[in-house]
Amino acid sequence: MAKAVGVNGKRAAVLDLRSTDPEEWENDVRPPLKNYADITVYEMHHRDFSLDSVSGIQNKGKFLALTEQGTTSSSGEKTGIDHLKELGITHVHLLPSYDYASVDETKLDKAQYNWGYDPQNYNVPDGSYSTDPYKPDVRIREFKQMVQALHKAGIRVVLDVVYNHTFNADESNFERTVPGYFYRQTKDGQWANGSGCGNETASDRAMMRKYMI
């Protein structure tokens, strides 16, 4: 249920979310869309999109990578948000941006990789994509800056969220909050695995539906 967490998402933080708003955030709006038939979607992973050594992007692999303008590769091609603009897309589909479990945010100097389909805290941006995973406000502010920059570029944002399972049912925040409620179980009391990921959330139960929707 947390909306702010510290490094690796182990503890929630209490903060005024308004303090994380970038300048002019109150004026941020989705770009207009005349017809659904006009939609052109570009799927991207935060880290992959900007990590290349010749991307010309300063904040490689971070939310802020998508706020940098005027970046080019070593051979002069547009990169980053300028590349997205020249493609003429209407939407970016961002692979999981929420806090996920498999990347250790205390060791970002070491090679680690995951698409992010191992949710830990659904309502918090992942710290590995922020410039300081130890500060709860930084990841939120930088995520908002990214969204704001994309909107200003005329690009809508779609978030990829997987609610059908979590990283670890036994140690999940759901299970710690209400044991046995948020996950389906087999007749012998084991975690059901309809997702193929080791567990499956019980979307048929009222509070899980409310959480998702």
Task: Go through the PLM ranges and name each one.
Residues 1-43, 48-68:
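The feature marks proteins involved in alpha-glucan
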Residues 47-213:
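Substrate-binding/active-site clefts of carbohydrate-active enzymes
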